[in-house]
Protein backbone atom coordinates (compact mmCIF):
# COMPACT_ATOMS: atom_id res chain seq x y z
CA UNK A 1 0.00 0.00 0.00
CA UNK A 2 1.02 3.60 -0.63
CA UNK A 3 2.92 5.30 2.20
CA UNK A 4 1.87 8.82 3.11
CA UNK A 5 4.42 11.39 4.30
CA UNK A 6 2.96 14.75 3.26
CA UNK A 7 -0.54 15.20 4.66
CA UNK A 8 -2.88 18.03 3.70
CA UNK A 9 -5.79 19.10 5.91
CA UNK A 10 -8.99 20.76 4.69
CA UNK A 11 -11.68 21.81 7.17
CA UNK A 12 -15.18 23.24 7.15
CA UNK A 13 -15.25 26.87 8.22
CA UNK A 14 -17.57 28.19 10.92
CA UNK A 15 -17.45 25.22 13.30
CA UNK A 16 -15.57 25.13 16.60
CA UNK A 17 -15.91 21.32 16.59
CA UNK A 18 -14.08 21.15 13.27
CA UNK A 19 -11.28 23.34 14.63
CA UNK A 20 -10.95 21.17 17.74
CA UNK A 21 -10.73 18.05 15.57
CA UNK A 22 -8.13 19.65 13.31
CA UNK A 23 -6.00 20.51 16.34
CA UNK A 24 -6.18 16.88 17.49
CA UNK A 25 -5.37 15.64 14.01
CA UNK A 26 -2.43 18.04 13.66
CA UNK A 27 -0.99 16.93 17.01
CA UNK A 28 -1.38 13.25 16.10
CA UNK A 29 0.26 13.65 12.68
CA UNK A 30 3.18 15.67 14.03
CA UNK A 31 3.79 13.05 16.72
CA UNK A 32 4.28 10.59 13.85
CA UNK A 33 6.87 12.97 12.34
CA UNK A 34 4.80 13.66 9.23
CA UNK A 35 4.82 16.83 7.15
CA UNK A 36 1.45 18.56 7.64
CA UNK A 37 0.08 21.25 5.30
CA UNK A 38 -3.04 23.29 6.10
CA UNK A 39 -5.41 24.69 3.49
CA UNK A 40 -4.96 28.46 3.69
CA UNK A 41 -8.60 29.31 4.47
CA UNK A 42 -8.74 27.10 7.56
CA UNK A 43 -5.23 28.24 8.57
CA UNK A 44 -6.54 31.81 8.90
CA UNK A 45 -8.82 30.78 11.79
CA UNK A 46 -6.15 28.68 13.52
CA UNK A 47 -3.70 31.25 14.88
CA UNK A 48 -0.32 29.92 15.92
CA UNK A 49 -0.68 26.67 13.97
CA UNK A 50 2.98 26.80 12.87
CA UNK A 51 2.38 24.77 9.71
CA UNK A 52 2.99 25.24 6.03
CA UNK A 53 -0.12 26.46 4.21
CA UNK A 54 -1.37 26.04 0.66
CA UNK A 55 -4.36 26.85 -1.51
CA UNK A 56 -6.77 23.99 -2.07
CA UNK A 57 -5.79 23.65 -5.72
CA UNK A 58 -2.09 23.35 -4.88
CA UNK A 59 -2.59 20.84 -2.06
CA UNK A 60 -2.92 18.14 -4.69
CA UNK A 61 0.55 18.94 -6.00
CA UNK A 62 2.41 18.88 -2.67
CA UNK A 63 0.57 16.19 -0.66
CA UNK A 64 0.39 12.39 -0.73
CA UNK A 65 -2.93 12.36 1.16
CA UNK A 66 -5.57 14.97 1.99
CA UNK A 67 -7.76 14.60 5.08
CA UNK A 68 -11.07 16.48 5.05
CA UNK A 69 -12.62 17.39 8.41
CA UNK A 70 -16.30 18.27 8.04
CA UNK A 71 -19.39 16.82 6.44
CA UNK A 72 -20.13 15.34 3.04
CA UNK A 73 -20.46 18.85 1.60
CA UNK A 74 -16.89 19.63 2.61
CA UNK A 75 -15.65 16.48 0.91
CA UNK A 76 -17.64 17.26 -2.24
CA UNK A 77 -15.87 20.59 -2.58
CA UNK A 78 -12.48 19.00 -1.95
CA UNK A 79 -13.19 16.24 -4.47
CA UNK A 80 -13.86 18.67 -7.29
CA UNK A 81 -10.57 20.46 -6.63
CA UNK A 82 -8.39 17.40 -6.03
CA UNK A 83 -9.67 14.76 -8.49
CA UNK A 84 -7.42 16.00 -11.29
CA UNK A 85 -4.36 15.31 -9.11
CA UNK A 86 -5.27 11.64 -8.48
CA UNK A 87 -4.57 12.16 -4.77
CA UNK A 88 -6.21 9.99 -2.08
CA UNK A 89 -8.79 11.72 0.12
CA UNK A 90 -9.87 10.62 3.62
CA UNK A 91 -12.86 12.05 5.48
CA UNK A 92 -13.39 12.67 9.20
CA UNK A 93 -17.07 13.31 9.88
CA UNK A 94 -18.02 16.55 11.57
CA UNK A 95 -21.27 16.95 9.65
CA UNK A 96 -24.68 15.30 9.63
CA UNK A 97 -24.93 12.22 7.40
CA UNK A 98 -21.35 11.17 6.74
CA UNK A 99 -21.80 8.97 3.68
CA UNK A 100 -18.36 10.05 2.45
CA UNK A 101 -16.64 11.24 5.64
CA UNK A 102 -16.85 7.96 7.50
CA UNK A 103 -14.34 8.28 10.38
CA UNK A 104 -15.98 9.38 13.64
CA UNK A 105 -14.10 11.99 15.72
CA UNK A 106 -13.90 9.63 18.70
CA UNK A 107 -11.97 7.08 16.60
CA UNK A 108 -9.72 9.62 14.85
CA UNK A 109 -6.33 8.46 16.14
CA UNK A 110 -7.12 4.75 15.77
CA UNK A 111 -8.49 4.89 12.22
CA UNK A 112 -6.04 7.45 10.86
CA UNK A 113 -3.18 5.37 12.28
CA UNK A 114 -4.49 2.32 10.41
CA UNK A 115 -4.53 4.29 7.16
CA UNK A 116 -1.03 5.66 7.72
CA UNK A 117 0.19 2.11 8.43
CA UNK A 118 -1.12 1.00 5.04
CA UNK A 119 -4.32 -0.70 6.18
CA UNK A 120 -7.09 0.86 4.10
CA UNK A 121 -9.42 0.46 1.15
CA UNK A 122 -9.42 2.65 -1.96
CA UNK A 123 -12.56 3.45 -3.94
CA UNK A 124 -12.42 5.22 -7.28
CA UNK A 125 -15.50 7.43 -7.53
CA UNK A 126 -16.19 9.09 -10.86
CA UNK A 127 -17.35 12.68 -11.24
CA UNK A 128 -19.60 14.35 -13.79
CA UNK A 129 -18.64 17.31 -15.91
CA UNK A 130 -21.33 19.73 -17.07
CA UNK A 131 -21.27 22.44 -19.70
CA UNK A 132 -23.94 25.03 -20.46
CA UNK A 133 -23.93 26.27 -24.06
CA UNK A 134 -25.77 29.23 -25.60
CA UNK A 135 -25.75 29.81 -29.35
CA UNK A 136 -23.10 27.07 -29.60
CA UNK A 137 -20.79 28.88 -27.16
CA UNK A 138 -19.88 27.64 -23.67
CA UNK A 139 -21.10 30.02 -20.94
CA UNK A 140 -20.53 27.83 -17.88
CA UNK A 141 -18.70 24.67 -16.82
CA UNK A 142 -18.60 22.68 -13.61
CA UNK A 143 -17.82 19.31 -12.05
CA UNK A 144 -19.89 17.25 -9.62
CA UNK A 145 -19.22 14.21 -7.47
CA UNK A 146 -22.89 13.87 -6.51
CA UNK A 147 -25.13 15.44 -9.12
CA UNK A 148 -25.84 18.01 -11.78
CA UNK A 149 -29.30 19.51 -11.24
CA UNK A 150 -31.48 21.61 -13.54
CA UNK A 151 -33.96 23.52 -11.38
CA UNK A 152 -36.15 26.66 -11.61
CA UNK A 153 -34.07 28.70 -9.17
CA UNK A 154 -36.20 31.30 -7.39
CA UNK A 155 -39.21 30.65 -9.61
CA UNK A 156 -42.01 28.20 -8.79
CA UNK A 157 -42.82 27.50 -12.44
CA UNK A 158 -42.13 24.20 -14.15
CA UNK A 159 -39.37 23.80 -16.70
CA UNK A 160 -39.93 22.29 -20.13
CA UNK A 161 -36.97 20.53 -21.71
CA UNK A 162 -35.83 17.70 -23.99
CA UNK A 163 -33.49 14.86 -23.03
CA UNK A 164 -31.02 13.22 -25.42
CA UNK A 165 -28.70 10.30 -24.61
CA UNK A 166 -25.72 9.70 -26.90
CA UNK A 167 -27.38 11.81 -29.57
CA UNK A 168 -30.68 9.92 -29.46
CA UNK A 169 -33.86 11.73 -28.47
CA UNK A 170 -35.38 10.22 -25.32
CA UNK A 171 -38.30 12.43 -24.34
CA UNK A 172 -39.52 15.90 -23.53
CA UNK A 173 -40.71 16.71 -20.03
CA UNK A 174 -42.46 19.33 -17.98
CA UNK A 175 -41.13 19.13 -14.45
CA UNK A 176 -39.69 21.10 -11.57
CA UNK A 177 -36.31 20.03 -12.87
CA UNK A 178 -33.98 17.13 -13.55
CA UNK A 179 -31.28 15.44 -11.47
CA UNK A 180 -28.35 13.69 -13.16
CA UNK A 181 -26.51 11.73 -10.48
CA UNK A 182 -23.53 9.44 -10.05
CA UNK A 183 -23.69 6.31 -7.86
CA UNK A 184 -22.14 8.48 -5.13
CA UNK A 185 -24.96 10.98 -5.54
CA UNK A 186 -27.68 8.33 -5.64
CA UNK A 187 -28.01 8.55 -1.84
CA UNK A 188 -28.26 12.35 -1.92
CA UNK A 189 -30.78 14.62 -3.70
CA UNK A 190 -31.65 11.91 -6.23
CA UNK A 191 -32.80 9.63 -3.41
CA UNK A 192 -35.16 12.31 -2.11
CA UNK A 193 -36.66 12.60 -5.60
CA UNK A 194 -37.40 8.87 -5.79
CA UNK A 195 -34.26 7.67 -7.52
CA UNK A 196 -32.65 4.26 -6.91
CA UNK A 197 -29.70 3.61 -4.62
CA UNK A 198 -26.71 2.56 -6.75
CA UNK A 199 -23.63 0.85 -5.36
CA UNK A 200 -20.53 3.07 -5.74
CA UNK A 201 -18.79 0.45 -7.91
CA UNK A 202 -21.47 0.70 -10.61
CA UNK A 203 -20.41 2.44 -13.80
CA UNK A 204 -23.77 4.09 -14.33
CA UNK A 205 -25.59 7.43 -14.26
CA UNK A 206 -29.16 7.92 -13.09
CA UNK A 207 -31.52 10.55 -14.54
CA UNK A 208 -34.24 11.50 -12.07
CA UNK A 209 -37.10 13.88 -12.98
CA UNK A 210 -38.23 16.23 -10.22
CA UNK A 211 -42.02 16.23 -9.84
CA UNK A 212 -42.75 15.56 -13.54
CA UNK A 213 -46.22 16.53 -14.77
CA UNK A 214 -46.94 12.98 -15.94
CA UNK A 215 -47.67 9.59 -14.43
CA UNK A 216 -44.99 7.94 -16.57
CA UNK A 217 -41.99 10.03 -15.54
CA UNK A 218 -39.58 7.60 -13.90
CA UNK A 219 -35.83 7.51 -13.20
CA UNK A 220 -33.64 6.09 -15.96
CA UNK A 221 -30.29 4.38 -15.29
CA UNK A 222 -27.85 4.61 -18.20
CA UNK A 223 -24.29 3.53 -18.93
CA UNK A 224 -21.67 5.60 -17.14
CA UNK A 225 -20.00 6.53 -20.43
CA UNK A 226 -23.17 8.05 -21.86
CA UNK A 227 -23.32 11.69 -22.88
CA UNK A 228 -26.50 13.41 -21.79
CA UNK A 229 -27.87 16.52 -23.43
CA UNK A 230 -30.67 18.58 -21.92
CA UNK A 231 -32.22 21.25 -24.16
CA UNK A 232 -34.21 23.96 -22.40
CA UNK A 233 -37.36 24.95 -24.30
CA UNK A 234 -37.04 28.14 -26.34
CA UNK A 235 -40.53 29.13 -25.18
CA UNK A 236 -39.67 29.04 -21.49
CA UNK A 237 -40.63 32.18 -19.57
CA UNK A 238 -38.09 31.75 -16.76
CA UNK A 239 -34.32 31.47 -16.45
CA UNK A 240 -33.59 28.15 -14.72
CA UNK A 241 -30.35 27.26 -13.00
CA UNK A 242 -27.86 24.42 -13.23
CA UNK A 243 -26.17 23.42 -9.96
CA UNK A 244 -23.18 21.13 -9.50
CA UNK A 245 -23.28 19.41 -6.09
CA UNK A 246 -25.52 22.26 -4.93
CA UNK A 247 -22.41 24.45 -4.66
CA UNK A 248 -21.61 25.81 -8.15
CA UNK A 249 -24.47 27.50 -10.01
CA UNK A 250 -25.06 28.70 -13.58
CA UNK A 251 -28.07 30.57 -14.95
CA UNK A 252 -29.63 29.20 -18.14
CA UNK A 253 -31.69 31.00 -20.75
CA UNK A 254 -34.47 29.57 -22.95
CA UNK A 255 -32.88 27.48 -25.70
CA UNK A 256 -29.68 26.72 -23.79
CA UNK A 257 -28.15 23.24 -23.91
CA UNK A 258 -26.67 21.43 -20.91
CA UNK A 259 -24.25 18.59 -21.67
CA UNK A 260 -23.37 16.13 -18.90
CA UNK A 261 -20.79 13.35 -19.14
CA UNK A 262 -18.26 11.44 -17.04
CA UNK A 263 -15.12 13.35 -16.07
CA UNK A 264 -11.89 11.52 -17.08
CA UNK A 265 -10.26 11.96 -13.65
CA UNK A 266 -11.66 10.10 -10.64
CA UNK A 267 -11.68 10.72 -6.91
CA UNK A 268 -9.56 8.26 -4.91
CA UNK A 269 -11.58 7.91 -1.71
CA UNK A 270 -9.88 6.21 1.25
CA UNK A 271 -11.78 4.08 3.80
CA UNK A 272 -10.69 2.10 6.87
CA UNK A 273 -10.51 -1.67 6.25
CA UNK A 274 -13.75 -2.31 8.15
CA UNK A 275 -15.76 0.01 5.89
CA UNK A 276 -19.07 -1.57 4.85
CA UNK A 277 -21.24 0.32 2.34
CA UNK A 278 -24.41 -1.51 3.35
CA UNK A 279 -23.78 -0.82 7.02
CA UNK A 280 -23.43 2.87 6.16
CA UNK A 281 -26.77 2.79 4.31
CA UNK A 282 -28.40 0.86 7.14
CA UNK A 283 -27.17 3.35 9.74
CA UNK A 284 -27.74 6.57 7.81
CA UNK A 285 -31.03 5.63 6.16
CA UNK A 286 -32.61 3.76 9.05
CA UNK A 287 -32.79 0.34 7.42
CA UNK A 288 -33.93 -2.57 9.57
CA UNK A 289 -31.37 -4.41 11.70
CA UNK A 290 -30.94 -8.18 11.93
CA UNK A 291 -34.00 -10.13 13.06
CA UNK A 292 -33.92 -11.09 16.71
CA UNK A 293 -31.38 -8.39 17.52
CA UNK A 294 -28.42 -10.51 16.33
CA UNK A 295 -25.19 -8.62 15.58
CA UNK A 296 -23.17 -11.49 14.05
From Swiss-Prot:
What's the main place this protein lives? Answer: cytoplasm
Cellular localisation: Cytoplasm
The positions annotated for binding NAD(+) are 72-73, 146-147, 157, 174, 176, 187-192, 247
The question of whether Cytoplasm is a record keyword is answered with yes
Keywords in alphabetical order, please: ATP-binding, Cytoplasm, Kinase, NAD, NADP, Nucleotide-binding, Transferase
A Gene Ontology molecular function term of the record = metal ion binding
SUPFAM superfamilies, per the entry: NAD kinase/diacylglycerol kinase-like
Report which reactions are catalysed by this protein. Answer: NAD(+) + ATP = ADP + NADP(+) + H(+)
Task: Give the annotated active site.
Answer: 72
Q: Name one GO cellular component term.
A: cytoplasm
| Root EC class | transferase
Q: Which GO terms describe its biological process?
A: NAD metabolic process; NADP biosynthetic process
Function text: Involved in the regulation of the intracellular balance of NAD and NADP, and is a key enzyme in the biosynthesis of NADP. Catalyzes specifically the phosphorylation on 2'-hydroxyl of the adenosine moiety of NAD to yield NADP.
The family assignment reads: Belongs to the NAD kinase family.
Instruction: Output the NCBIfam families linked to this UniProt entry.
Output: PRK01231.1 (NF002306)
Q: What is this protein called?
A: NAD kinase
Source organism:
Pseudomonas entomophila (strain L48)
- What lineage, starting at the top, does this entry show? Bacteria, Pseudomonadati, Pseudomonadota, Gammaproteobacteria, Pseudomonadales
UniProt lists the gene as: nadK
